[in-house]
Amino acid sequence: IVGEVWHDARRWLQGDQFDAVMNYIFNRACLGFFGGEKLDVSKRPGGYRLKRLTATEFAQEINRLLDLYAWEVTLVQLNLLSSHDMPRFVSLVGGDKDALKLATLFQMTFPGAPCVYYGDEVGMRGGSDPGSRGGFPWDEGDWDKDLLTFFRRAIALRRNHPALRRGQYAGLLADDDQGLYAFARKGEPETLVVVL
């Protein structure tokens, strides 16, 4: 059972209520770091203030998130970039699809269950609810095919490397000057290093 909890969900994740929650803490960290200067901080999805994050601040948020739950719980959290209750990621970052690509790569390489909200993979935009719940653009001429190809490759990367699904997580670098964050996923028989 996946619950919709926008904050620290430890009391619901003790093994007697929810198995996982929609990981809005993950969402806000991704918006803050990958959205950078293009992030619209005037929006308050779920009542939470959005904040731009340096690489160091992002690393601190990720470490806090990883320390919040037992590892087995972390591995099943529903990691989302967009949802039905908030503006879509690409809309919150001023249409910056490169920011969406970086966040998606992080989502597909981070512990937990990645959740792609329908339409994000083709560049669908949408503002606050009900704008975030628009109909899927079935006309393929409206799709960002480059973005769709990127999503497919990122998903295949996760599928083809067990360490990205079950491996341990280790932060390696947070460089504010370069705006870089790096981490490793360690599992048998491989260790993968991701630099964003």
What is the predicted role of each segment?
Residues 1-3, 22, 78-79, 116-118:
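Hydrophobic faces of well-ordered beta-strands that scaffold small-molecule active sites
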Residues 6, 104-107, 111-125:
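Substrate-binding cleft of secreted/luminal carbohydrate-active enzymes
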Residues 1-69, 96-97, 106, 125-153, ...:
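Active-site-proximal helices and loops of the catalytic beta/alpha 8
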Residues 68-95:
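Active-site clefts of carbohydrate-active enzymes
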Residues 6-9, 83-87, 122-124, 188-190:
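Short, solvent-exposed loop/turn segments at secondary-structure junctions
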Residues 76-77, 118-120, 166-171:
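Short coil/turn segments at secondary-structure boundaries
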Residues 1, 84, 107, 119-121, ...:
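Conserved, mostly hydrophobic/aromatic
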